[in-house]
Amino acid sequence: MKAAGLLLLLGTFAAALPARGDLRLEASPAEIREGLGWSGGTLRVRGEARPGDGVVVRVLGEVRKETWVLKRQRGPFWLSGERVLLAGAPEVYLLRAERPLEELLLPEEARGAGLGEGALAEALGLAGDRTYLASELFRQWRASGRLAAGEGGISRQGGHFEAAFALPASLAEGTLRVEAFACREGRIGDRGTVGVPVRREGLAAFLAEAARRRPALYGLGAALLALAVGLLVGVAFPHRRPH
């Protein structure tokens, strides 16, 4: 089940489908560099498809295993509940389509390419009687910018198209897989893929490496730094009592 989910996400079922051509595709920026002040950005994808073909563009982050803790609200409190293992969780899943997916592709075609929230839920192992988990997980991912999947956001001028994606403030190092699909009569025709490396630099890279190598020491250092900043603020802006 886990392996099948990962295959769905990456669209490797393409080998079983008819041969397709390649779309001309480019992404800007070609590389993402995260400094300490990184707070998200915009990734623009441009390409060329045959006039009349519908276009779907997807940005897929690194896929990894992840444990998600479902939280439930009890009165004013949020309590930790069920722990859910996500077999193939992408760092980000961003999708733009010219029209609703159900108008562009047959259900089995979209599912085979891992396109849409239904295919994503299946890849995560949250289909069937676990769809209630997918609904809550996707709500959280949308709020953090990790998930965005819907129609619109693609501009066309003849055969040329462009899509813009808002990137979240937190991106792990790795490679974003940018894919474009030309849809024709319910099937995927041409497609194109380009990779966008994500790298941390400067102090952000140092802190990330410190957190990875010495998590306990990093946590202690972060706590001491927060305490020091609090003391400095207290000294700089002393509380004045009313007379």
Kindly give the residue locations of the regions a language model identified.
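Short, aromatic-rich amphipathic segments at membrane interfaces
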Residues: 189-220
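Aromatic/hydrophobic beta-strand junction motif of beta-rich domains
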Residues: 45-49, 163-165
